[in-house]
Amino acid sequence: VTGHEAKAVQSEIGKALEEEMRFDQQLSVVYNRDYQEGQGTSVALGTRYLAPESAACFFIPGDQPFIEPLTLREIIEHWEPETIVIPLLGGRRASPVLFDRMFYDDLSKLTGDLGGRQVIMKHESHIKEVEVSGNNPFQNFDLDTPDDYEKALREMSEKGH
């Protein structure tokens, strides 16, 4: 789901697909014209575009580009029907969260800037927290500006990542 700078983001997605990424499934890029109303609107829109047969879904924040595939696999390994799987890094909740299809209806109605946290708060009894290996200390860096990105790259280089 794109919003701000949608054309630039879509262009970069296209480049990545051509150069290095391979997907076994179809990838859809959806523009959220209401993106300024908060990330909840993007989560809601994305949920409405999920394949009907999907069992669960991640919402991976676009401003956290260092989330590792290993983290995704570890989260998926702990998924069970009717759960919300939240990764922990060093005991702290992190991204991305894996939502079972049971929560799609709630997710599709989100508004505001809390995003999936609204659904998490509503369904505490369905939460499964999982400590993930998190080999990359930068995987939950929140990059909101080009300066944040440059700083993260410098720090990663200094630490040998």
Predicted feature descriptions by range:
Residues 1-62, 66-93, 125-134, 154:
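Nucleotide and nucleotide-moiety/phosphate-recognizing core
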Residues 53, 107-110:
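A polyampholytic, Gly/Pro-enriched intrinsically disordered region
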Residues 62, 94, 106, 138-139:
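Short, flexible active-site loop motifs that bind/organize anionic cofactors or intermediates
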Residues 72, 103-107, 149:
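A generic structural signal for short hydrophobic patches within well-formed alpha-helices
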Residues 95-99, 141-143:
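Short glycine- and hydrophobic/aromatic-rich loop-to-beta-strand nucleating segment
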Residues 109-161:
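Conserved alpha/beta core of the MobA/IspD/sugar-nucleotide pyrophosphorylase nucleotidyltransferase superfamily
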